[in-house]
């Protein structure tokens, strides 16, 4: 098993997390090379088994550690970059430029120039004015550039604040048709894809089905009006990490107790990908298009989320509060939005033996009032020195870790051969000072 207790100690891919904590200290991140590759292959197999041509572009902003990118480059993944430095990093990690796409809601002329000079062939466009910038950049680079138009969510009331915020990005259906007509006349730009985004952690086939119908209807109108055959439909990100739970009112009142095996895993990812692929193929076969488009996706959480854990130590206790040496700096997403499994490294006694544990609030190590890692979490009785593993810690964690009131922890890669290698040093004074410009002598206080 990926996570399991052996002789009373939590192991990840056969490696003792307590043993690693003794070696490395805490807190630290541990990423599984095998799990990364398995998650990617599961999505790839699921879509291929559904009988659709597919492209998977790993969303690099989810976790752009070089060790992660190297594993995925070797696996054959494509990549979605969100800034020019990410493009450069992807190239250094083994991604050829033809397997890189670029998406940023605010396109900057200087950055577009660098991205096109690097050979990136596909750029996402979020608003009509972006076409002017891209046309100019393509002409300066002497390049013909493929364009993916982002289709904005429409229809009905937004069901959540996040849904409402998401609708600020992209083009409406009429704007997509206008852009398609313009691109059909452009000597430098080619309409290659329509993309959309339903939101994070989407597992409902109904939502994807509605979006597929809408995009396929647009492709028919584009083909009829311009003669252009759009060859790719991109469902964007949102494919979930199946071990991460959305939080609702019921969750906030519950007292959960986590188990190592109560997670998703590559098998469930493959099943979900197959369901998405079959639904897309069924709908595409029902419309009049010259060919079934390629189905593209930009998974992030689904690949890297459950491939990592954050190990942290309880440093002190005060009533129901356990104070840890990790903080929300390392896991920035609010526990009021998502809930991850939290496992003690020492196997808890069986509840049947009269040890049900108790519920705790888990505080981070900073003075930030909101530095709370979880609330009302049922765990075995905790004492200072106890170790906890925060599961599903691979997405939007290391890439967003900051030196606010504490420095980011080290990151280690658990290799497929069972060896552990450090892939990011813990934050130190050099990291803190590197971007700063200082006077040659210390500043004097007062007059």
Spans of features found by a protein language model:
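Charged (often Lys/Glu-rich) extended helix/loop segments that serve as interaction or gating elements
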Residues: 271-286, 290-447
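General structural feature for long, well-ordered alpha-helical segments within catalytic domains
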Residues: 16, 32-35, 39, 43, ...
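Active-site loop/helix belt of alpha/beta enzymes
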Residues: 154-313
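Active-site-proximal loop/turn and secondary-structure-junction residues that shape catalytic pockets
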Residues: 62-64, 85-86, 106-108, 127-129, ...
């Amino acid at each position: 098993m990926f996570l399991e207790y052996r002789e009373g100690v939590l192991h990840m891919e056969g490696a003792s997390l307590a043993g690693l904590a003794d070696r490395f200290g805490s807190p630290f991140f541990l990423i599984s090379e095998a799990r990364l590759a398995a998650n990617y292959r599961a999505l790839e197999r699921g879509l291929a088994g559904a009988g659709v041509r597919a492209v998977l572009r790993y969303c690099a902003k989810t976790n752009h550690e070089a060790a992660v990118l190297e594993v995925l480059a070797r696996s054959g993944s494509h990549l979605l970059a969100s800034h020019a430095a990410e493009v450069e990093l992807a190239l250094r990690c083994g991604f050829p430029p033809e397997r890189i796409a670029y998406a940023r809601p605010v396109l900057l002329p200087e950055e577009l120039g660098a991205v096109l000079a690097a050979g990136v062939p596909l750029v996402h466009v979020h608003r009509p004015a972006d076409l002017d910038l891209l046309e100019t950049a393509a002409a300066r680079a002497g390049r013909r550039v493929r364009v993916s138009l982002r289709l904005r969510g429409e229809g009905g009331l937004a069901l959540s604040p996040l849904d409402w915020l998401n609708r600020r990005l992209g083009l409406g259906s009429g704007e997509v048709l206008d852009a398609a007509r313009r691109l059909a006349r452009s000597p430098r730009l080619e309409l290659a894809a329509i993309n959309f985004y339903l939101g994070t952690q989407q597992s409902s086939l109904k939502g994807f089905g509605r979006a597929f119908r809408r995009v396929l209807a647009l492709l028919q109108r584009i083909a009829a009006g311009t003669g252009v055959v759009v060859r790719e439909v991109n469902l964007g990100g949102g494919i979930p990490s199946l071990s991460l739970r959305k939080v609702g009112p019921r969750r906030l009142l519950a007292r959960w107790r986590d188990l190592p095996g109560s997670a998703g895993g590559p098998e469930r990812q493959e099943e979900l990908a197959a369901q998405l692929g079959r639904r897309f193929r069924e709908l595409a076969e029902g419309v009049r298009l010259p060919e079934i488009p390629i189905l593209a996706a930009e998974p992030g959480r689904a690949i890297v989320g459950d491939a990592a854990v954050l190990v942290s130590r309880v440093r002190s206790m005060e009533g129901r509060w356990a104070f840890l040496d990790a903080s929300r700096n390392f896991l920035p997403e609010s526990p009021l939005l998502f809930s991850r499994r939290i496992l003690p490294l020492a196997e808890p006694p069986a509840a049947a033996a009269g040890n049900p544990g108790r519920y705790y609030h888990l505080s981070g190590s900073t003075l930030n009032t909101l530095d709370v890692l979880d609330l009302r979490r049922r765990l075995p009785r905790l004492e200072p020195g106890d170790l906890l593993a925060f599961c599903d810690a691979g997405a939007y964690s290391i890439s967003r870790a900051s030196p606010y009131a504490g420095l980011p922890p080290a990151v280690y890669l658990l290799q497929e051969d069972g060896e552990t290698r450090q892939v990011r040093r813990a934050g130190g004074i050099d990291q803190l000072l590197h971007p700063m410009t200082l006077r040659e002598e210390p500043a004097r206080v007062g007059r």
